[in-house]
């Protein structure tokens, strides 16, 4: 083989990554690969992960790294021009609709037969056991075929990450209050917070609930879920008895708007929540010392830079509304496409085995966390494993010991160990939730974040039916595209006008709003969404 290979790396990985082993007497199978470049990846062709795959499978991966800023469009142009393609194209290529379109053009091939052959899909089959559900259904296109190797990161912390509320505990204690459980209790607490000089600076600058991005913001989702299920990331769609509809056309939505408008009218929620963005206004707001009572976001005190103060925010569950509704937005960990195999590939089974090997547990960890024995180790393999602790215990035991993750992943430093998640990977909940740290090194922030994630995961406030992953055909996607932008703009602007009081919300304006939505072909979007949803649940 033309490239040198580290025997130590091979031995370290061979125990956990399953595949057939190529004969040393056979010439390597040449496979060309297209991938988007990475500023912190030295050379894909000499990368340790590449070398391991080549040695294990008896292949010669000839990799071309394209400019990441134009990668998807580059591939699209090549396909539409009928150009010869690399055997393997790594990446999501613009999403499911684009991938299905490429399949319909004959540019990429179905992999379904390989997926359902456990002798070929060795690691994918094992991954189904690891993650606890058969993700092949979520990879299946409208024609019943699977066209990509899956990428999946199950994250205990991410699934409710955009809908968690956090309260500043020193203020809660100063007010002699407890976490609110109803919309009425929340309003009363916010009234006390903004009326009291809690930070002791003699100014009336206390903020009840900080947020950004208007009705697309996390703060709005959290409040509206006291009235009806609300998830802007899924187009504000909800499902009742198998029927997909828009939350923003319901009477409960109107009640929620009236409630939130009342909070804004009293100055309990700043109107800046409707106009400011994350990078500027919101970040500046929450980094003004001791001014914010409530925040809603991925982490406790999201975007706050003071790590000690962040640790003083604790998670609060959604409140119950006057009609008894109490739900929380939920974004399930679902697979996406990590790579496809083109019709130009002369050995598609071997190309599939490359993707299959990439998703084995150890390579899936390596592509994110770095080199085993240097950046991380399995806690179970350490003599001093009991010295490591995990903030998610007892729900998840310590699984991987991390030594300097911020230097490997967060620094942007050049490395040649892994593909930095450019490739397919599959990680179960226990990996991210089982990240372990040397005893005594976890911060209060780490603990509060884990407690918040666990609180929402175990509360049981997710509706039985929700929209998660909708795979559209190219024709269906065009219908969505034609309707979505203008409709969403109208929804945002009209609801913002009601929330600020710029427009009165009454029967006349509400009915006019519903008629306008109807005139903008919302029903056409719902029709294709319903079809995609039915496919996703096997109808």
Predicted feature residues:
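Extracytoplasmic/periplasmic substrate-binding proteins
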Residues: 100, 212-236, 261-426
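Conserved small-residue motifs centered on glycine
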Residues: 36, 363-496
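Secretory-pathway/luminal and periplasmic proteins that interact with or process carbohydrate-rich
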Residues: 84, 97-101, 194-203, 215-223, ...
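Positively charged n-region of N-terminal signal peptides that target proteins for export
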Residues: 1-9
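Helix-loop-helix "hinge/cap" segment bordering the ligand-binding cleft or interdomain interface
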Residues: 112, 141-218, 238-284, 339-374, ...
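Loop/turn elements at helix/coil->beta-strand transitions in domains of secreted/extracellular proteins
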Residues: 27-31, 57-61, 82-87, 105-109, ...
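Bacterial N-terminal signal peptides
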Residues: 8-17
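Conserved N-terminal structural module of periplasmic/extracytoplasmic solute-binding proteins
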Residues: 6, 19-188, 231-236, 244-248, ...
